[in-house]
């Protein structure tokens, strides 16, 4: 189950958006 990987990617994506 890749839910953890997906969650990590989502968090990383959101974090990047917040940094801009």
UniProtKB/Swiss-Prot annotation:
One of its GO terms (biological process) is defense response to bacterium. The modification Glutamic acid 1-amide is found at residue 20. It is found in: Secreted. Expressed by the venom gland. Belongs to the cationic peptide 04 (cupiennin) family. 04 subfamily. This is Short cationic peptide-4d. GO terms for molecular function: toxin activity. GO terms for cellular component: extracellular region. Keywords: Amidation, Secreted, Toxin.
